[in-house]
C-alpha cells in the first residue's frame, strides 16, 4: 500500500491539475504515469451538457476503434438455423438458444458481448434482470440485435465498443491499452471523439463537452483541452 501511495504521488507530481492538455500530451502523460504492473486499460471520460431525461437527448451507440481495444471479447450469439451457423463461422465463442438461457440463469457469465437475431429477443428478454444491469442486453442501437450476425461478431472481435450517457451526461469508453503506441491511442481517441460529436443532440444548448479526461486503470485523470479538439 505504501509503495502504491508513493507511485501515486510521483504520478501526481508530473501532472498539472490546473492545466488542460492536448490529446497528444494527455496520452503521453497517461502512459508515463501508469504504475500498474499489468497492461492497463486507457479510458476516456466525457461530461456532456445534455439532459438525458429528454428522449431526444439520450446518447447511446457503438463504433469500431481503428486500432482495436487490445482486448479479445468473448462473444455469445442467440440464433438458430442458418444464422447460428453464420455466427459460428464468423468466430462466435458461444451460439445457442434455450440452452444458453438456462446456463445464464444458473449463474454462468463468461462472455463479454451478447448478440441476437430479432426473432430471438422474446427468448433473450427472459434474461433482462441478469443482462440489463451488466449492459449486456442486445440492443438495435448498438448493433447487437441484427440479422447480420457475421458482421456483428466480426466487429465485436475487432475493436467494437459501446457507449451510453448516464443520468449526469457522463460517457466513458475504452480507447486501448498502455502498451499501445501513443499514435494508435490518439487515433482511437480521435475516432471516438468524432463519433461523440456526430451524435450531439440537435436540441442540446450551450457548450456540448464540458469536461474531458483520459486515464488508465488505477491511474490519475488527465484533463484534456476541449478547445483543442
Swiss-Prot record:
PANTHER family (alphabetical): 54S RIBOSOMAL PROTEIN L1, MITOCHONDRIAL, LARGE RIBOSOMAL SUBUNIT PROTEIN UL1M
Function: Binds directly to 23S rRNA. The L1 stalk is quite mobile in the ribosome, and is involved in E site tRNA release.
Name the UniProt record assigns to this protein: Large ribosomal subunit protein uL1
Gene Ontology BP terms: regulation of translation; translation
GO cellular component assignments: large ribosomal subunit
Annotated signal sequence range: none
CDD domains for the chain: Ribosomal_L1 (cd00403)
Homology family: Belongs to the universal ribosomal protein uL1 family.
The keyword Hydrolase is annotated on this UniProt entry: no
UniProt feature coiled coil, ranges: none
Subunit composition and interactions: Part of the 50S ribosomal subunit.
Name of the gene this protein is made from: rplA
Keyword annotations: Repressor, Ribonucleoprotein, Ribosomal protein, RNA-binding, rRNA-binding, Translation regulation, tRNA-binding
GO-annotated molecular function: rRNA binding; structural constituent of ribosome; tRNA binding
Annotated source species: Streptococcus pneumoniae (strain CGSP14)
